Structures are given as structure tokens and as C-alpha cells.
Amino acid sequence: MRQKRFLCLKGIVFAWLFTILLAAGGQHVCFAAEENVPQQTVYDDAALLTPEEIETLESELDAAGEKTGWNILVLTTDDTNGKTMQEYADDFFDAIAENGDGVALLIDMQNREICISTGGIASRYLTGARIEDILNDGYEPISDGEYEQCLSVMLKDVLVYY
């Protein structure tokens, strides 16, 4: 009788360990698959950028993200859904960013403004005065209709302050 209890207990422990290991192994495979999926970094909802400009920006954003470890995103919009551009940029960043660290650069065509949203550790690097400097550098190209150039200049300025 004691032998049967021992075998039963041994079987339960083995099944429990097998289940734990299988679950942990399956989780690892899922995480590995997610790592290979590139994250979108340019959201051109206002259709301001050409495919070539989007490709160039994505390359710059990917390199900047690797350097900083931040989520760095670009958004263009022509409708902020009744929100201020800062609220819109903040909500967008919070919804899209994988972690809280990073920057979203926004061109808002509805209000004809540019905006920067920061999150996490990026907020320590990009103070209010630095954001103003970055925005000031972005106004010249955007006033000439050079949207990609505006975003590229702002991104380079972000990296200066990193």
C-alpha cells in the first residue's frame, strides 16, 4: 500500500513539474517570436510623408531607439479627436510604447503645431527648456512644408540631449 502511495505521489509530482516546464518553455518561445517582430515607429495618419521619407525616418528612429533604449515614435495627424495636441500625443505614446521610456514627436495639422511627448527616463533628459529648443529647431523646416526634415531635425536634437 505504501508503495502505491509513493508511486502515485511521484506521478503527481512528475506531472506537476512537466506542466510547469512546458508552460515556461512555451512562454519563452512566445517571447522570442515577439522580439523578431519590428515595432512600427512612424504613424503618418495625416499622409504628409512619402514612402521613402517614412523608410528614412524609420531607419533613423530604429538607430536612435537602439542607442537610447527608448521607444521613439513619430505621429502625424489631422484630427486630435477633441483633445489638445499634448493630450493626444501623451495618450498616443502611452498606448503604443512598449515601456514607459521614450519620446513621441507629433505634427498636428489640425492645429498647425508640433509637439513632443516624453515618458519615463526620457523626461529627465528632455526638460521643458530642452523641448522648447527642439521645437524651435523644428519650426523652420515645417514652415517650408518639409515635414520629414522637421521630424529628422527634432530627432537629432533629442539625441543631442541624451
Predicted regions and their residues:
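A structural boundary signal for the start of the first folded domain, especially the loop/turn
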Residues: 2-162
